[in-house]
Amino acid sequence: MEARAIARYVRISPRKARLVLNLIRGKHVDEALAILKFTPKKASKIVEKVLKSAIANAENNHNMNRDNLYVAKAVADEGPTMKRVLPRAMGRADIMRRRTSHITIVVKEKEE
């Protein structure tokens, strides 16, 4: 049995979100929350919120025991990119890309 939580259109680059997700993949949920709490990255707050949602989904919707939960899957997929114009010298303009992510976390119960 698995429970999942998805945060879509999050205003953080998928590349930066993956740095944080790689830290928690395969870990027990309580250990993962502890890691996220002390990780000094913007993405860690967002990932922590999604992980807490996945844990709540597991407990409330699937009657799973929190003590046996671990992070089975943690991915950051690319969302739509917002393009903005950045004025430069001599009448030129650059495109600034504001990237978004879809963050998915799946938790499963450890098999005894």
Swiss-Prot record:
Keywords: Ribonucleoprotein, Ribosomal protein, RNA-binding, rRNA-binding. PROSITE patterns: RIBOSOMAL_L22 (PS00464). InterPro entries: Ribosomal_uL22, Ribosomal_uL22_bac/chlpt-type, Ribosomal_uL22_bac/org-type, Ribosomal_uL22_CS, Ribosomal_uL22_sf. It comes from the Bacteria. GO terms for molecular function: rRNA binding; structural constituent of ribosome. One of its GO terms (cellular component) is cytosolic large ribosomal subunit. One of its GO terms (biological process) is translation. Pfam families: Ribosomal_L22. This protein binds specifically to 23S rRNA; its binding is stimulated by other ribosomal proteins, e.g. L4, L17, and L20. It is important during the early stages of 50S assembly. It makes multiple contacts with different domains of the 23S rRNA in the assembled 50S subunit and ribosome. The globular domain of the protein is located near the polypeptide exit tunnel on the outside of the subunit, while an extended beta-hairpin is found that lines the wall of the exit tunnel in the center of the 70S ribosome. Belongs to the universal ribosomal protein uL22 family. Part of the 50S ribosomal subunit. HAMAP family: Ribosomal_uL22_B. NCBIfam families: rplV_bact (TIGR01044). This is Large ribosomal subunit protein uL22. It comes from Caldanaerobacter subterraneus subsp. tengcongensis (strain DSM 15242 / JCM 11007 / NBRC 100824 / MB4) (Thermoanaerobacter tengcongensis).
